[in-house]
Amino acid sequence: MTGYVANIEKLSIENENFRAVLYTDKNVQLVVMSLLPGEEIGMEVHHLDQFIRVESGEGKAILDGVEHAIGDGVAIVVPQGTNHNIINTSSEKMLKLYTLYCPPNHKDGTVHKTKADAEADEAEHFDGVMSE
């Protein structure tokens, strides 16, 4: 296989995991995420660039202290070094999104069912192994 082709909207909406890595190459990684009602990713900063697109739900993105309302179809670009957080503000509906890390941030094939699983996995950062 060369590259990755899939209906990312469908995969994002169907995903029930906090995080699932779908594809990893040396310069880019595709990940789907789902946040439970009221859940947040948590304030973080990366030494890489990140693109996020919301497929379903509502929430807010905080980039270097500035809050932005987000929902279906909203795109977020997070330049390296930016403190950021994504928060699901709904009390009923999951926030479904996908993200591109440039370069990769997680081990290829990583799946975290819950945020607690992700926080407990100390060895899940990108190790140089790609999807193909």
Predicted feature descriptions by range:
Residues 49-59, 64:
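Glycine- and acidic-residue-biased ligand/ion/polar-headgroup-sensing regions
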Residues 28, 37, 47, 66, ...:
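A generic "binding-loop/recognition-motif" signal
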Residues 43, 62-64, 68-69:
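Helix-adjacent hinge/juxtasegments
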Residues 60, 80-107:
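Ligand-binding loop in jelly-roll beta-barrel domains
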Residues 66-80:
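Short acidic-glycine-tyrosine-enriched beta hairpin
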Residues 1-27, 113-132:
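A short, N-terminal "cap"/entry segment at the start of jelly-roll beta-barrel domains
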Residues 15-16, 31-46:
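Conserved short histidine dyad/triad with adjacent acidic residue
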